[in-house]
Amino acid sequence: DVSELMQNSKAHLGLMFANMNIPDYADLCFVGSVPFYAVAHPKHALAKLPAITVAQLISHRQILLKGLNGRQLEQFSPMSAQVWWANDFYLIADLVLQDMGWAYLPCHMVEKDIKNGLLCKLPLTLDHKPWSAPVDRIMRKNQPMGPALTWLAHEIKMRFEQRG
């Protein structure tokens, strides 16, 4: 979605999950990664298991992210035979909070809900550490940069650097 906005000159700067298909109009800068937890409602069947294999995920509804254009993002592949799609992590979190399925969500979005017992971090055997998705800052090549855009481009890099 962000790449298309850049291509159509509807945005000057964006953040997107890294993609191996680098558009020729794009100036990309890797800024960091976003860690994710697999989560479910505490009453969900998966939340009661001490360790969860990929085979055990197949029969439980997974809620996954798709772009506004309806395309599946390469970083978010289905692990379940039953998938619901949403185009917003906040919507996915709401569905998981209502015990509609399980999902991978950014750690910073769900840590408070996990701490408060509203969500349960799933002990997936394939996740020794939180899974992280690389993030790129995207800008159009050779676009003129005024002081505000220069500041914002730099500030985004610094914010990701501060997060570790």
Where are these regions (language model features)?
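A bilobed periplasmic-binding-protein/Venus flytrap-type ligand-binding module shared by bacterial periplasmic
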Residues: V39-A45, P134-M145
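Glycine-centered flexibility motif
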Residues: G14, Q82, K141-N142
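Central regulatory/effector-binding core of bacterial HTH transcription factors
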Residues: D1-P23
